[in-house]
């Protein structure tokens, strides 16, 4: 079946899905959770086929591709968490009366058909499907060739579970064609698809934006900063940086760049770098920070634009909060940015002027996540400004429409 035909099939199934009650949708999700749990060994064995042929087994992408029993069961827990979330469809977000006799309600409604194009992340196959179903949207899944066996296996388990439960399995479509041509064909199905979400690095985001005839909700990489201000609690700053870098360095919300107020650098750089070395982190430093610790490596200018996704970070001194804000807005990707400070006015200036989906005060950047924000599973982190920004959960997969009632009102 062609990609275009699959998109048309998804459009027809979306109309059926919009008639499902919350209870119906939760039954579908429950069937998916039970299916994944029952067939976890099959999923892991198919994942191993992808792992065996993956070229760089030390890369961040390899870690994202890897599935084991713990990670598969985390996917199951994620599905069950979405079951417990409030269904946004039909929620009245505003309601008012007009002198003309109109009673107007603004109501949340599904988008229709959502296509997700993603890289070597088999967990997205589950997250995207269940979030779309719960929010009343049909899903079209197009993963990468690096995860093709894993994605096929997960989709097969989900599809069979949904059909066995007595529901329309076509509410989730899987594009088996992992080529660029297949992706381009999907991106031209504007008559069938309402929204496309790229989930991956800047290259994928650029490809989708350049080729799509469908509105795009960009979920891109992170180039996250932590600014340590002159009023910062230095021990608190070290702990926050360690968690933001080392908790899971392959994620887009891991910190990559440390900006340090020059007035505290002599005190802070040595204690930070002792901790970083203990954690196995490679530090790329500007000339001033390198002069304080010659065990660091001198950073090149291009390093400050890098998303390392590994145990590497940069250190750079700045002359104050305004300088830090300028650096972040110039080099950041509008993802997650943090200030460590004990000065409330300085914190307010930072959170007001830094252009990012999430700004943090004395908090690890690792919290930019659907589960941590209480959204359940997420479709990605939107770094754009239109429609939705930050973690893409259920509400972000709906739009608002108007229901207007009257007792025969006529416009004069």
List where the protein language model places each region.
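N-terminal Rossmann-like NAD(P)+-binding subdomain of aldehyde/semialdehyde dehydrogenases
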Residues: 1-106, 131
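ALDH superfamily catalytic-core signature
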Residues: 120-123, 127-135, 157, 161-164, ...
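Conserved C-terminal structural/oligomerization subdomain of aldehyde/semialdehyde dehydrogenase
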Residues: 300-412
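Structural motif
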Residues: 112-116, 130-131, 137-140, 170-173, ...
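Rossmann-like NAD(P) dinucleotide-binding subdomain of oxidoreductase/dehydrogenase enzymes
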Residues: 93-235
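A structural signal for short, well-ordered beta-strand elements
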Residues: 16-19, 230, 317, 340
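Flexible, glycine/charged-enriched surface loops at secondary-structure junctions
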Residues: 22-26, 166-172, 248-254, 280-288, ...
């Amino acid at each position: 079946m062609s990609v275009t035909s699959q998109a048309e099939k998804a459009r027809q199934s979306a109309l059926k899905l919009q008639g499902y009650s919350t209870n119906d949708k939760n039954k579908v999700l429950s069937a998916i959770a039970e299916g994944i749990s029952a067939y976890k060994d099959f999923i892991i064995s198919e994942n191993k086929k992808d792992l065996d042929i993956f070229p760089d087994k030390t890369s961040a992408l390899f870690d994202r591709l890897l599935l084991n029993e713990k990670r598969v069961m985390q996917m199951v827990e994620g599905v069950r968490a979405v079951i417990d979330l409030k269904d946004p469809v039909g929620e009245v977000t505003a309601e008012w009366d007009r002198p003309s006799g109109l009673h107007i309600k603004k109501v949340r409604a599904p988008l229709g058909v959502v296509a997700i194009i993603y890289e070597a992340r088999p967990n997205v196959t589950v997250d995207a499907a269940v979030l779309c179903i719960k929010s009343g949207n049909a899903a079209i899944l197009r993963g990468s060739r690096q995860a093709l066996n894993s994605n096929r296996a997960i989709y097969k388990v989900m599809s069979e579970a949904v059909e066995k439960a007595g529901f329309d399995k076509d509410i989730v479509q899987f594009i088996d064609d992992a080529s660029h041509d297949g992706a381009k064909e999907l991106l031209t199905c504007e008559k069938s698809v309402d929204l496309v979400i790229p989930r991956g690095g800047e290259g994928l985001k650029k490809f989708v934006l350049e080729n799509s005839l469908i509105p795009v909700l960009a979920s891109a990489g992170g180039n996250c900063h932590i600014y340590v201000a002159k009023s910062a609690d230095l021990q608190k700053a070290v702990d926050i940086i360690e968690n933001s870098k080392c908790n899971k360095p392959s994620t887009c919300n891991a910190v990559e760049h440390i900006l340090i107020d020059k007035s505290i650098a002599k005190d802070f750089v040595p204690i930070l770098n002792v901790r970083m070395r203990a954690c196995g982190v490679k530090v790329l430093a500007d000339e001033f920070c390198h002069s304080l610790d010659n065990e660091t490596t001198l950073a090149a200018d291009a390093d400050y634009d890098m998303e390392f996704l590994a145990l590497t970070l940069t250190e750079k001194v700045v002359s104050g909060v305004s300088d830090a804000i300028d650096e972040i807005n110039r080099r950041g990707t509008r993802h997650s940015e943090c200030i460590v400070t004990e000065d409330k006015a300085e914190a307010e200036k930072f959170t007001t002027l830094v252009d990012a989906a999430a700004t943090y005060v004395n908090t690890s950047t690792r919290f930019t996540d659907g589960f941590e924000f209480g959204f359940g599973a997420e479709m990605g982190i939107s770094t754009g400004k239109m429609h939705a920004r930050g973690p893409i959960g259920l509400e972000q997969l709906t739009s608002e429409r108007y229901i207007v009632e009257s007792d025969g009102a006529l416009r004069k």
